[in-house]
């Protein structure tokens, strides 16, 4: 027995990475080892599989400096929720398609936002109903992709322009108020 183990160990590449998720094991256990795609030709089942993936190096490079940024983590969940549609569209673009679980993880990593699936999924469904997103329904999840990237970018660009204008106006009004308050206090001390 020991000789057999040594022989098997010698055949195994120690540097090989073996990866699986608990859900993979659970689905095998529940199905008694039967394939979900046993009734399909081999290639058809392969196109319907989707594996959760971390952000690619290209995606991380796109968002470099933004991920796990302490300053972005100060943005409240309420503000993230208010602009969730545009944020989701950008995250889906960066990933070139994503499932809801990945988007929730990205929101947490980008903004420190602890949003529930009950907050995010209705927005994804609404965007799909509006035709902004295409949905690929798989056995255990949905994968969302932009149906019209240019239209989505136009929508996001418009929203960002409005936010910038709104922020600039608020900043200008606040600066005026502070200046008037300061002048008012200066006159009171001179009197």
Curated annotation (Swiss-Prot):
<dbReference type="Pfam" id="PF03551">
    <property type="entry name" value="PadR"/>
</dbReference>
<dbReference type="InterPro" id="IPR011991">
    <property type="entry name" value="ArsR-like_HTH"/>
</dbReference>
<feature type="binding site">
    <location>
        <begin position="140"/>
        <end position="145"/>
    </location>
    <ligand>
        <name>DNA</name>
    </ligand>
</feature>
<keyword id="KW-0614">Plasmid</keyword>
<comment type="function">
    <text>Expression of a 9.5 kb p-vac DNA fragment containing 2 divergently transcribed regions (gvpD-gvpE-gvpF-gvpG-gvpH-gvpI-gvpJ-gvpK-gvpL-gvpM and gvpA-gvpC-gvpN-gvpO) allows H.volcanii to produce gas vesicles. A similar region restores gas vesicle production in H.halobium without the p-vac locus, but it still has the c-vac locus.</text>
</comment>
<dbReference type="GO" id="GO:0003677">
    <property type="term" value="F:DNA binding"/>
</dbReference>
<dbReference type="InterPro" id="IPR005149">
    <property type="entry name" value="Tscrpt_reg_PadR_N"/>
</dbReference>
<dbReference type="InterPro" id="IPR036388">
    <property type="entry name" value="WH-like_DNA-bd_sf"/>
</dbReference>
<feature type="region of interest" description="Disordered">
    <location>
        <begin position="31"/>
        <end position="51"/>
    </location>
</feature>
<comment type="subunit">
    <text>Interacts with GvpD.</text>
</comment>
<dbReference type="InterPro" id="IPR036390">
    <property type="entry name" value="WH_DNA-bd_sf"/>
</dbReference>
<dbReference type="GO" id="GO:0005737">
    <property type="term" value="C:cytoplasm"/>
</dbReference>
<keyword id="KW-0963">Cytoplasm</keyword>
<protein>
    <recommendedName>
        <fullName>Transcriptional activator GvpE1</fullName>
    </recommendedName>
</protein>
<keyword id="KW-0238">DNA-binding</keyword>
<feature type="region of interest" description="Leucine-zipper">
    <location>
        <begin position="150"/>
        <end position="181"/>
    </location>
</feature>
<comment type="function">
    <text>Plays a regulatory role in gas vesicle synthesis, activates transcription of the gvpA operon, and probably of the gvpD operon. Gas vesicles are hollow, gas filled proteinaceous nanostructures found in several microbial planktonic microorganisms. They allow positioning of halobacteria at the optimal depth for growth in the poorly aerated, shallow brine pools of their habitat.</text>
</comment>
């Amino acid at each position: 027995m020991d000789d057999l183990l040594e022989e098997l160990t010698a055949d195994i590449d120690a540097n090989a990475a073996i990866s699986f998720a608990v859900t993979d094991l659970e689905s095998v256990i529940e199905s008694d080892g039967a394939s979900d795609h046993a009734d399909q030709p081999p290639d058809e089942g392969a196109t319907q599989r989707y594996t959760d993936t971390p952000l690619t190096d290209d995606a991380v490079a796109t968002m470099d400096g933004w991920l796990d940024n302490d300053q972005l983590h100060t943005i409240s969940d309420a503000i993230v929720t208010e602009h969730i549609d545009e944020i989701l569209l950008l995250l889906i673009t960066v990933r070139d398609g994503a499932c809801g679980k990945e988007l929730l993880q990205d929101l947490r990593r980008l903004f420190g936002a602890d949003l529930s699936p009950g907050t995010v999924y209705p927005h994804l469904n609404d965007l799909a109903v509006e035709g902004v997103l295409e949905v690929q329904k798989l056995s255990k999840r949905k994968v969302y992709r932009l149906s019209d990237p240019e239209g989505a970018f136009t929508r996001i660009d418009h929203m960002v322009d409005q936010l910038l204008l709104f922020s600039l106006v608020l900043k200008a009004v606040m600066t005026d108020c502070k200046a008037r308050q300061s002048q008012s206090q200066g006159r009171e001390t001179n009197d």
